Amino acid sequence: MHEMSIVEGIRTAIEEAARANGFAKVTRVRLEIGRLAGVERAALDFAFDVVLRGSLAEGAAVQIIDLPGQAACFDCGKTVEIEHRLDICPECGGTRLLVQGGDEMRIKDLEVL
């Protein structure tokens, strides 16, 4: 379950931001997660409950902004939306796609006290 290590990284980033900016409590964490990032949402929710326990973000609301998968098709030259890495081009049926977005994951912002 790599979601635990993802949330551990988020906890570290929150702690570093708290030290740098002087806040004591996080009430909301907004994340941008691409559909191609390979993150299981139920496992991520569980990891947040476990990893953030006892931290300044314990009990914070977690909002996930879903980013679509995007790929460039070498066959028709279009940029298309995809759901999975091995999808075919919805425009031409081509199989030579290069992922260009939707595999990212980042903290968009924090609501703090």
From Swiss-Prot:
Family annotation (Gene3D superfamilies): 3.30.2320.80
Alphabetized InterPro entries for the sequence: Hydgase_Ni_incorp_HypA/HybF_CS, HypA/HybF
Top-level taxonomic group: Bacteria
Function: Involved in the maturation of [NiFe] hydrogenases. Required for nickel insertion into the metal center of the hydrogenase.
Presence of keyword Hydrolase: no
UniProt keyword terms in alphabetical order: Metal-binding, Nickel, Zinc
Pfam family, any one: HypA
Name of this protein: Hydrogenase maturation factor HypA
HAMAP family (UniProt xref): HypA_HybF (MF_00213)
Gene, per the UniProt record: hypA
Family that this chain belongs to: Belongs to the HypA/HybF family.
Annotated residues for binding of Ni(2+): 2
The keyword Transmembrane is assigned to this record: no
Positions that bind Zn(2+): 73, 76, 89, 92
Sample GO molecular function, one term: zinc ion binding
Any GO BP: protein modification process
